[in-house]
């Protein structure tokens, strides 16, 4: 196992390097940049994130047409006409764009190895402080969603396996598959319209993680307020998230039920409940429990972004989204580095969990 762990840890380095390199090249090739963002603010042509994404930025389009039609402009930045070139050079030095791309990339990697992510371009904070500030929101959302999905999926999968082929199995499979096919952000919008938009019911808060004056509440009231705000975001992610785990639990149980040791246990006169909970459950749950780290990372990656944006939860997903829109490169690459490193680490932990709970698995020899 030691050799396998060392090999996997060493494999993280080139994997992380490749992911960072590809994304760095894509970002460099993409139009726009932090200097152009600052120019748009300086000239008063900047718009908010929604306008840029929806394509309604008519001011920027007009500026681009003017830039392309003016043959005397030597600036390589859109909207920089009339701005002192010396000022642009100062901006390049301030943001580090006076150096070639490969030197900036190597310097960035060297800083990231020491977990020095620099300062945000447009926020008066260090990137590490920003990430640490937003991390509890994303972890809370991902962790509670994962726990609720496991709490629902495992009993449902066991019940489907016991009643395999029944009408309950058919209809429950239809429901979970349909729920899995609908994106979580559609559920989020539907829940807002129904339960917090004021159109039908106004039972839950529309945005945020806590109410104003949360610190002044009693300990129990703070817990209630916290889950009151998390109810709709978690529900929107849980509805479409338990299909895969439910079917995995069902298939794992069906595979174990048909094995010889179950037939032997029944032949000895053990009750069906004793057979299922005392023998089948322990073996069938190995693959389900071992997949918890990977499931948590998957939910954190795929569900957090849009859910945080829709419900205005100030977490890593919303931070990364704003960084991409505003071309805040330090926050963008730091978020990418953090999520990639977390994903690779949790994947290793998941594999090690398999080995711990099932000694038959040997990743060194690739045998079971």
Model-predicted regions and their roles:
Residues 1-29:
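Internal alpha-helical transmembrane segments
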Residues 66, 79-82, 86-154:
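An internal, D/E-rich "acidic patch" concept
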Residues 2-3, 136, 144-168, 184, ...:
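Alpha-helical transmembrane segments of integral membrane proteins
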Residues 12, 20, 43-45, 177, ...:
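Residue-level recognition of pore/gate-forming positions within transmembrane alpha-helices
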Residues 22-31, 175-208, 236-242:
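Membrane-water interface segments at the C-terminal ends of transmembrane alpha-helices
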Residues 3, 47, 53-82, 155-179, ...:
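Cytoplasmic juxtamembrane interface segments
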Residues 12, 134, 138, 174-177, ...:
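Residue-level signal for discrete positions within transmembrane alpha-helices
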Residues 18-100, 200-222:
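Hydrophobic alpha-helical transmembrane segments of membrane transport/permease proteins
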